[in-house]
Amino acid sequence: MNLRPRCRKWLPLATQQLRLRNLNRIQGFNIESWPHEKSLELDDPDDVLLYYTLHTDKASEAFYTSEKLPQRHQQQKWAEICTDDEAWRKTNAQCVCVKVWKHYSAERRDGQPPEVEQRHKDVFGRSQLTPSRLPRPPELLFSWGVYFSGLIPLSPLTLSQCGRNCLVFQLNGEQFASPSMISEQALQSQLHLHYQKYAEEEKLEEPQDEGINSPAVSRSSSPVLRMSTMRYAQLKCQRQEIRRSNNLEKLLTLQRLQRLHQQKRRQMAEVCREIARLSVHCVTRNELRLKPRTTSLSGDYSAHQYHSMGRALSVLLAEQQQIAPLTLYNAQQLTRRIEALSSQQRLLKAERETFRQRNERTRQLLKEMREQREAQQWELHSQRHRLEKERLELRTLAPQHLEQRDQKRQIERQVERRMSTLVLELQEIYNIQNVGGRQFSICGIAFPHMEQYTSESRQAANAQLLDNVSPLAVSAALGYVAHLVQMLAIIMDRPLRNRILYEPSKARIVDDIKELTYTTREFPLYTRSILPSQQTKYAIYLLRQNVSQLCFDITGQCDLRNTFGNLLELFSTLRYIERTQRDEVDERDGTAVGAGCGEARLANGLTAPHLSQSHSSVDMNHVPLPTGVNAVKDALLQQLLPPGVSEALAIEGYASTQRICRSVGSYSDGEDEFRPRLEHNYSNSDSNITLQTERS
């Protein structure tokens, strides 16, 4: 493995190390290749080969395998460990795992001579092998985990007294073994030899710390183990057995010179290879015309005139066998060609490797794309199945949807028609007429134009107009208008901007939106004087806002100053809607039934003569209940309108009903309750500004 140590025997010095790089040989003693319970069929010892392997640990691969030798009972001598591995030479490992194997030879398995076995093998081959003729794998006999500092040196006399399956390690010219593999008698003789070598008068006083680098490797109290594993800093030896060594400086110098020598040798080898490579390239075409020389050029002065230094080197290198210049030239051309081809080969290899990696990446990408495509195909397939199911369901539900849509449209038309009918009936209840002079009447009660009534100007026309209007009539008319607006909002299902608190002639309106300086948000829609108060004017202004809101929401246009005009426009629009839908129903149902009757029916089921014969004193409790289509409309109206309202609005079968005004007597609450109580703070609301006449 490495150079042998210069000392003739091993000394237990603290500076002398036991490492894996110092291992030279391993020997085996008393190795048994079969268990104690011998089977009926024993192996022939000549067929069994023993060898060992070295491992860094029990589970690692073997980094060294010895030769296979036939089994010998007493001593198994394997060859020295020889390796050129630099890692082995420089290793600093203090332990190693040794495994001993049993190998079966395949030449003499069936008891025949090797010549006959080889002839049979050549003839028949290995086509018909029985289980008894198949090669058997090697078997592990035992394995050791060896820590070199725990081994003890052995004397030649002690080797014969080793135990079963004992391994002996040769380190630094000395043989070491495990103390557990040595018998007690051998240990006693080993102790005797130790005392003879290191007598008390020949060695120094033993230190208190049991020497340098001498840890307790065993828990045993045996003096033999303690003395065999001890390391000493100094030892007394015979003078004739000691040879003086170099100091540290000289050793470092020798090491440096050895390194320089090795470096020079490597450089010389590189120069020789370069000379051998370039010697052929020195031949030129001019030298080919010269005659080839058969002798050396050394000593010939004229040779330097015709030959270059490269030629001289070529001749010197080829003195043993002269080569013709033409041959050298051909060799030069071939060498150049070979170098060019080698360069091309390297380039092609690099390009092939590049294309191989590119193809590998492309194949990987193609594989991923295929997987993605398959996943997408599967997803699309499942989505298509789901789509087909949904399409079938939609095709099944399409007629129902069309039928429901037609029903919805029909119901919407019926609801609109019913709303229009109810609103027109409200118009019949609260009949609004223009009595001339920009005055209107509701249920026979005259009411002036609201813009003039709420105007702040003191013109003679306004004063005369106000003198002709009674406060009680104004209160009753405002109550009718408030109730009409509230009923319109309920029937048309429209929220009002300003909430109305209806009490026939004492109605009030609430402003919940603006910031007010008044202490209350309820404003009266009645008055007791000819000139209305500020609260009454503001209440009329809020009522006009509600009317304008409804008119704009239904008709799309409104005039805030013309309250009764907005109501009349609203009634005209709803009458047109009701008439149009009635014509559509009549066209769909056919005109034959209408022609047979000779008279057209209105929305409430009555004819025009019935409407002309109506009277305001008709008792609503004695109106006959509707049948047929009207019953369906009433049921639909009860579902659409809020509870409590549908019952009050489902009035059908009468032509005209006039509401008799509730007489307004003395009011219990006066206008003093709604005196403006202005706060002293400032507000951005437009309600605290004095209402003026709205002008276009």
From Swiss-Prot:
Residues 681-696 have a biased composition (Polar residues). GO terms for cellular component: endosome; lytic vacuole. GO terms for molecular function: SNARE binding. Residues 251-278, 330-394 form a coiled coil. One of its GO terms (biological process) is negative regulation of cell population proliferation. The modification Phosphoserine is found at residues 214, 218, 666, 668, 685. Disruption phenotype: Larval lethal at 3rd instar. Adult viable flies exhibit genitalia-specific organ rotation phenotypes. Residues 666-696 are annotated as: Disordered. It comes from the Eukaryota. Keywords: Coiled coil, Growth regulation, Notch signaling pathway, Phosphoprotein, Transport. The modification Phosphotyrosine is found at residue 667. Involved in biosynthetic vesicle transport to lysosomes. Acts as a cell growth regulator. Also has a crucial role in controlling organ rotation by regulating membrane-localized Notch receptor endocytosis and subsequent degradation. Regulation of organ rotation is not by induction of autophagy. This is UV radiation resistance-associated gene protein. It comes from Drosophila melanogaster (Fruit fly). The lineage of its organism: Eukaryota, Metazoa, Ecdysozoa, Arthropoda, Hexapoda.
